[in-house]
C-alpha cells in the first residue's frame, strides 16, 4: 500500500488540468485514468468527438482524441504518475482516504493506495438511444452536444433533428437554427416538458418546428468508411406510420448520467447524481475531497469549463495539503 499526497480519479480535461497544476507544484499527483471506466475510454467524452473547434489555441480545430493525448502527455511531462486502472472503491470516512482498484476490491483486501486529498473528475456520459445506425454515424452526423458540434461544416445549411422535449432540447434546437437550414424537434409525447418560456420560444422560432408523438427508429447514411448520415426514419407513435426524412444531423438532448457511483453515500449528490460543490469552488461536503469537470457540472459540460474547474480543484487541493499536511515524498504506509 502506497501513500500519495493527492490522487486524481478521471481522465478528461478536468483531470489532466488538475494533474498539470499539481505536478508543477511538485505534489507528485497520481492519476487513475481507468480502463474503460464507466464504458468510456481514457480521455473521456472528448475521445468520441472528431473535431474540436471551440478550445482556445487551435485556430484550425483539433481532433478530440488528439487533444486528450496532448493533455495526457503534458501531465506526464511535469511528473504526473498515470495508472491505467479503474478505482472501484473509495473509503472517504477518514483521512488518509483509502482506495481499491477493480483488481483488488474483494472483501477484506488491503487498499492499493491512500491519499491526503482526492479529486473526483469522473465525468458524465451522454445518454444514447441505441438506434439502428447510431454506432455507424456517431460523430458522423449524430452528436449529443449541439454547442460542441453544431457549427461544424457538415451541419451548415442542412436539415437537422433534435430528440428530446425538455429545456435542453429547446435550447439546443434554437442554437442549431443558427447553422442548419431547418431544425425539427422530435417529442415522444403530445407536449413539451420544457418550461413555458422555453417552449414558447421554440414554437415561435421561424426555423424550428416540433413533431409531437414522434420517435426516431433508424439512422440512415452513406455506405462507406466515415460515411455521413443523410436520412432518418421516424414513426408516429399513435398511428405507427413510418417515413424516411432527409436529415444530415441528429442531436440527442435526452440527458447525461454523471459517473458518481464511486462516491454515492459518501459525498453529497443532487437528485440527478451530480456531485454538489460549494458554489465557485471545487469543495464537496467532505473535507479533502474535491470535484471538477462534468461530474459536478450539469449545465455547461464543455471541455474548457472542465479544464477551468480542474485548475480550481488543483489550486484548492494544493492549499488544503499545505495547510493540513507536511510536504514529504510519497512513501509506503507501514
UniProtKB/Swiss-Prot annotation:
FAD binds at residues 11-14, 40-41, 45, 54, 148, 294, 301-303. Its cofactor is FAD. Disulfide bonds join 145-148. One of its GO terms (molecular function) is thioredoxin-disulfide reductase (NADPH) activity. GO terms for cellular component: cytoplasm. InterPro entries: FAD/NAD-bd_sf, FAD/NAD-binding_dom, Ferredoxin-NADP_redctase_2, Pyr_nucl-diS_OxRdtase_2_AS, Thioredox_Rdtase. It catalyses: [thioredoxin]-dithiol + NADP(+) = [thioredoxin]-disulfide + NADPH + H(+). Keywords: Disulfide bond, FAD, Flavoprotein, NADP, Oxidoreductase, Redox-active center. Binds 1 FAD per subunit. It comes from the Eukaryota. SUPFAM superfamilies: FAD/NAD(P)-binding domain. One of its GO terms (biological process) is removal of superoxide radicals. It is an enzyme of class 1 (oxidoreductase). The active site is a redox-active disulfide bond. Component of the thioredoxin-thioredoxin reductase system which may be involved in biosynthesis of penicillins and cephalosporins and may be important in determining the thiol-disulfide redox balance. Homodimer. This is Thioredoxin reductase. The lineage of its organism: Eukaryota, Fungi, Dikarya, Ascomycota, Pezizomycotina.
Amino acid at each position: 500500500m502506497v501513500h500519495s499526497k493527492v490522487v486524481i480519479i478521471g481522465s478528461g480535461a478536468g483531470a489532466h488540468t488538475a494533474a498539470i497544476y499539481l505536478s508543477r507544484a511538485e505534489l507528485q499527483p497520481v492519476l487513475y485514468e481507468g480502463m474503460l471506466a464507466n464504458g468510456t475510454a481514457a480521455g473521456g467524452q472528448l475521445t468520441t468527438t472528431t473535431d474540436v473547434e471551440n478550445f482556445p489555441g487551435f485556430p484550425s480545430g483539433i481532433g478530440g482524441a488528439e487533444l486528450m493525448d496532448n493533455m495526457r502527455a503534458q501531465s506526464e511531462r511535469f511528473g504526473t504518475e498515470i495508472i491505467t486502472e479503474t478505482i472501484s472503491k473509495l473509503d472517504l470516512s477518514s483521512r488518509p482516504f483509502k482506495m481499491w482498484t477493480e483488481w483488488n476490491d474483494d472483501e477484506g483486501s488491503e487498499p492499493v493506495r491512500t491519499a491526503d486529498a482526492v479529486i473526483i473528475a469522473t465525468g458524465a456520459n451522454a445518454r444514447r438511444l441505441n438506434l439502428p445506425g447510431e454506432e455507424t454515424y456517431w460523430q458522423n452526423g449524430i452528436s449529443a452536444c449541439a454547442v460542441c458540434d453544431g457549427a461544424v461544416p457538415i451541419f451548415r445549411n442542412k436539415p437537422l433533428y433534435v430528440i428530446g422535449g425538455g429545456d435542453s432540447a429547446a435550447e439546443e434546437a434554437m442554437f442549431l437554427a443558427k447553422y442548419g437550414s431547418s431544425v425539427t424537434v422530435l417529442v415522444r409525447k403530445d407536449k413539451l416538458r420544457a418550461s413555458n418560456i422555453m417552449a414558447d420560444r421554440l414554437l415561435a422560432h421561424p426555423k424550428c418546428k416540433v413533431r409531437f408523438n414522434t420517435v426516431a427508429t433508424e439512422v440512415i447514411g452513406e455506405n462507406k468508411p466515415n460515411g455521413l448520415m443523410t436520412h432518418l426514419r421516424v414513426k408516429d407513435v399513435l398511428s405507427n406510420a413510418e417515413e424516411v426524412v432527409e436529415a444530415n444531423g441528429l442531436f440527442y438532448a435526452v440527458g447525461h448520467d454523471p459517473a458518481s457511483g464511486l462516491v454515492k453515500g459518501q459525498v453529497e449528490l443532487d437528485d440527478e447524481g451530480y456531485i454538489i460543490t460549494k458554489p465557485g469552488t471545487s469543495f464537496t461536503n467532505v473535507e479533502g475531497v474535491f470535484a471538477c469537470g462534468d461530474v459536478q457540472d450539469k449545465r455547461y459540460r464543455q471541455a474548457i469549463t472542465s479544464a477551468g474547474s480542474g485548475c480550481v480543484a488543483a489550486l484548492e487541493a494544493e492549499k488544503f495539503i499545505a495547510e493540513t499536511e507536511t510536504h514529504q515524498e510519497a512513501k509506503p504506509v507501514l
